[in-house]
Amino acid sequence: MVGCLVPASEIEQLAGKLNFHLSELKELYDADEYHFTDICNHKNQFEGIDGFDALSMIQIFAEIIKEYDIKIVTQTITSEMLEKNGDLIAGVDAIARECGFSSISEAQKNESRALILNILNAKKYVESLSGDNEIAAVFCDEGLRKNNAETKIKLGGKDVEIDFCSSKEFPYLQVADFAAWALTRSKLNLEKSQNKEMKDFDLMTMKILEDIVPNYINIEAVSTNAGYGINIDKTFDEIIK
């Protein structure tokens, strides 16, 4: 689960920039969203895209994150984390029930846990900048709830809305989609390049993504050489403490 923190004062400008790039995307590729997995694999609407254009799209979103200083919060749930942090997870599950997340499967439970922990991590971060800061609203890709559904979470004694929407209708979500893709792609590039030289496209991708490493606020991400990618080594205990 990946979330992005955008200052309320920047929302309108960010929307204008995203809509401009989305209109270009529609004109060039007849696509409504930036699907970076498809872009890099030359699939679906992006079947005919060349490497330069693919890198340009990655650069666009990296520059958006830098320009608006968008902070990125990540949360992954694993069986080991659940075993080691039973009390924490029990508390998170209680919050999930208060939010109305009636999860049937374990996967749905973990999705709601990741969402709530992400929100709590985001709250902790914005309050660390200034005691006056707060989470104004949360927008989440449809999954736990259908498009246009909403619920609330209590933060600091206040009810904060969680609105569920599609990334096609709510373009801000595409920034979070990109941030999630960037993290996954970095790990994949690392795995593929063990003991061998990274391919040119992957190396250029890593060089672009290296610039947004500091924006991931709750992982320790260090790149001493773009050719070797990003090393993520902060533990779950460090993230939640």
Describe the role of every protein-language-model region.
Residues 1-241:
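Phosphate-ester processing/binding pockets and catalytic centers
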